[in-house]
């Protein structure tokens, strides 16, 4: 039997990532983005927007994330895609629709394309909870980037399973 695992050491061929970031609740999403960038940079990824390893795509809100993510995934240019957003419960059912559709859309893209898509859309009851998860207590953006690094590495390690 073979054991496959992702690695956090820089690969021989550099990874390419796309980050899809929702502008809505940007107070939160910009902090998540900062956490992602910090993690990627500390793991040898060039996070400069003018560089060749990370592309940044801003969308209006979390509902629009799956559409853009799918376009990126089918392009075949990325080892992993990180989706960042924040959906905060309000007084209407809008939260349920946006959060549910974003989650379903993102999950479908990963399974349909074989490209790791990291679900980094916070779903919280309050802005305070979102801010705690985006930097006050810890920054989930760091964890989303770690997931992307591990999955990109794992998919490369498993590539021989789909060849020839």
Swiss-Prot record:
One CC-aspect GO term: riboflavin synthase complex
EC assignment: 2.5.1.78
Cross-referenced PANTHER family: 6,7-DIMETHYL-8-RIBITYLLUMAZINE SYNTHASE, 6,7-DIMETHYL-8-RIBITYLLUMAZINE SYNTHASE DMRL SYNTHASE LUMAZINE SYNTHASE
Alphabetical list of SUPFAM superfamilies matching this protein: Lumazine synthase
Source domain of life: Bacteria
UniProt keyword Transferase, yes or no: yes
UniProt pathway annotation: Cofactor biosynthesis; riboflavin biosynthesis; riboflavin from 2-hydroxy-3-oxobutyl phosphate and 5-amino-6-(D-ribitylamino)uracil: step 1/2
Signal peptide positions on this chain: none
Protein name as it appears in the record: 6,7-dimethyl-8-ribityllumazine synthase
Entry binding sites for (2S)-2-hydroxy-3-oxobutyl phosphate: 91-92, 133
GO biological process, one term: riboflavin biosynthetic process
Source organism of the structure: Synechocystis sp. (strain ATCC 27184 / PCC 6803 / Kazusa)
